[in-house]
Amino acid sequence: MAFLLYYTLFISFMLWLAALLIISFSVYGSPEKVKLIKKTSLFFSFFQFILIIFFWILSDNISVLAEFDIYNFQFYKQWLFLYNFHYVIGMDNISLLFLLLTFFLTPICILISWNSIKYRYNSFIICLIFITFILFNIFCVLDLVFFYIFFESILIPMFILIGVWGSRQRKIHAVYQLFFYTLLGSLLMLLGILVIYSHIQTTDIRVLYNTNFSFYRQLILWASFFFAFCVKVPLFPFHIWLPEAHVEAPTVGSVILAGVLLKLGTYGLLRFVIPIFCDATYFFLPLVYTLCLLGIIYTCCSTIRQVDLKKVIAYASVSHMSFVILGLFTSNIQGIGGSVFLMLSHGIVSSGLFFCIGCVYDRYKTRILRYYSGLVSTMPIFSLCLFILILSNISFPGTSSFIGEFLILLGLFENNHFAALIATFSIILTAVYSIWLYNRIIFNRLVVNYYLRFSDFSKKEFVVGFIFCFITILFGLKGSYIISLIEAPLYVYLSFK
């Protein structure tokens, strides 16, 4: 067990070492050394991914610490002590899966940016490494104060990533929307943390799980945390910043934003709001269902009207994340397990869709839907990759999203038949805009010979596209293993009801 503790510290150390190496290249290197920086960053990111997989294999059969068994965390380590604030890291299988998603997307982002980031590549890699490090801490830290610090710190590198390497003139407007929407929302969580500290003199999550707050205090704390996390998800009607941020972000920024950052809000709901404020969760359940169902229907209808390819996927992401929140608040193992699975699936599928859109944008320099048609005749491999990802986006059986949405609907039917009926109807709307989008850009008659000037996937793009499609199908066929991993910690959360 001690080996696992030091192993985790080693992962954290490797992240910082990678960042320092990249910084040294940036300071002392010349523009001719950009290729060396690319190879070095790719090596470190891939090495970190191998490390976390190795840790996953090692920890699979290791028992939990006895004094920490009720939380089903596999380990914890206290580093810093400041008043009653502890920098404590810990991990259960849910944290581990989100870390796997983070470390999986990091080398993918470097491959995507290999030719698409044309300037200041050194600074871009520094930004990406620090995003990875902050995400590592968000998924592992066990103190609310430090969670809040890292939760807000992620805005800084994302602000730089979109503001510097964004694609159009409105990128500054987009990053200000991203920054201020999420910052103002998180101030509510800060107020909630202050209320908690004034009440029990600690913000340690392990203590909070055993603390019984009064009902009225729970209502206040639930509202402060819920709306802070819903802005980050984002849930309707707090979603205004997301389509603009996606449109202006580079492909890598969209992959990170859709793949991991949108999961921070739902992760916070699962880790803090639902198990700690149980009574308030039941009290506000009608409000949550109403917001989620309105968001699903509204975003599905809005998606059909969009003309920008990135906005289509952005609104689809809002719809899927509303589905996730529906599952989290079913308070049964099927719904919550389906939500966790759908979060992981959405991280893969939406990242793959934004990658495909980035590929055609790099060639044709436009994302307007009406300029695309008949791409199957010039980009057949791209068309096949997009087809697999579109199938997963509509939750086709055999793909990853099907398992998550099916479990969510199964759990929702146990609680509210009407909500489950509306959520099921939204799947039809998702299929409508997804299939129409694919048919419009892939199978329509080729009317512009300009498209014939460009080739299909390059070798690097083929590797990235193949990985996305392979993981999507693998999750769809072998999803039972992922479900078995998260069952134990989910039963622990349900025990707090």
Swiss-Prot record:
| Mitochondrion keyword on record | yes
Instruction: Please list every transmembrane segment annotated in the UniProt record, as residue ranges.
Output: 3-23, 42-62, 94-114, 122-142, 144-164, 178-198, 220-240, 250-270, 276-296, 313-333, 340-360, 374-394, 418-438, 463-483
Q: Which cysteines are joined by disulfide bonds?
A: none
Q: Which InterPro entries match?
A: NADH_Q_OxRdtase_chainM/4, NADH_UbQ_OxRdtase, ND/Mrp_TM
Please provide the record's keywords in A-Z order: Electron transport, Membrane, Mitochondrion, NAD, Respiratory chain, Translocase, Transmembrane, Transmembrane helix, Transport, Ubiquinone
* Membrane topology listed for this record: Multi-pass membrane protein
Question: What EC number(s) is this enzyme filed under?
Answer: 7.1.1.2
Source domain of life is Eukaryota
Cellular component terms per the entry's GO annotation: mitochondrial membrane
Intracellular or extracellular location(s):
Mitochondrion membrane
**Which EC class is the enzyme in?**
translocase
Q: Which reaction does it catalyse?
A: a ubiquinone + NADH + 5 H(+)(in) = a ubiquinol + NAD(+) + 4 H(+)(out)
- What does the record list as GO biological process? ATP synthesis coupled electron transport; electron transport coupled proton transport
Q: Give yes or no: UniProt keyword Transmembrane.
A: yes
Pfam family, any one:
Proton_antipo_M
Molecular-function annotations in GO = NADH dehydrogenase (ubiquinone) activity; ubiquinone binding
The UniProt family comment states:
Belongs to the complex I subunit 4 family.
**Described purpose of this protein according to its UniProt entry:** Core subunit of the mitochondrial membrane respiratory chain NADH dehydrogenase (Complex I) that is believed to belong to the minimal assembly required for catalysis. Complex I functions in the transfer of electrons from NADH to the respiratory chain. The immediate electron acceptor for the enzyme is believed to be ubiquinone.
Supply the name of the protein. NADH-ubiquinone oxidoreductase chain 4
Q: What is the protein's species of origin?
A: Acanthamoeba castellanii
